[in-house]
Amino acid sequence: VAERAGIPFVNGSSSSPALTERGLKYFFRVSPHDGQFTKLMFDFLDEFQKKKNIKISSASILHEDSAFGTDSATTQEKFINDKKYKLLNKITYNAKATSLSSEVQKLKASNADLLLPSSYTADTYLFLKTAKELDYNPKMLLAQNAGYTDPAFVSTAGKDAEGAITRSPYNDDLAKRIPNLSKVNE
């Protein structure tokens, strides 16, 4: 709509790389896209493996079926291949699903070293609840923002949130040390 009307659209949160790869004249992003975030996630994995002297050799992707989840999964798959990890699963589900039992059973059966979920808040809670019920405990969970960075995530998920690692465009810990950072984020 903004493109047709010739009105600049400043996007503060959508992270799909496709949005800036379409050649739109009036679309502007003020934060990194999933390609940049995912690169940093995999840089973190490289460092983590060195520091902890562990080896990650396999991964599974779990994502909801919107542009966010699909584009995120596509980007993650590229990095998995580039890093020579074995992709064991790439599982898509409807974000409004009322059950993730079959998806979690597949993840549990494959037992990948790394789980990369891309989910919104409600499906993040559904995944965690289902994983607990089915005793699925991924060795490492590295999430793509959204549901895992919802302000209520830790308080709502409680102990089930422990061990989840996520990327975020904003860091509250940094804001405590750099007072003006919160103003910039607003």
Task: Kindly give the residue locations of the regions a language model identified.
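Short, surface-exposed amphipathic charged segments that create phosphate/polyanion-binding patches used
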Residues: 104-108, 156-157, 179-183
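Short beta->alpha junction loops
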Residues: 89-99
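Extracytoplasmic ligand/sensor domains, especially the bilobed periplasmic-binding protein
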Residues: 1-90, 140-174
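Generic recognition of short, well-ordered alpha-helical segments
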Residues: 71-75, 102, 126, 179
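Aromatic-lined carbohydrate-recognition surfaces of secreted/lumenal glycan-active proteins
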Residues: 115, 138-141
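Extracellular/periplasmic ligand-binding modules, especially the Venus flytrap/periplasmic-binding
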Residues: 121-124, 173-186
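Hydrophobic alpha-helical
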Residues: 1-3, 98-99, 105, 110-134
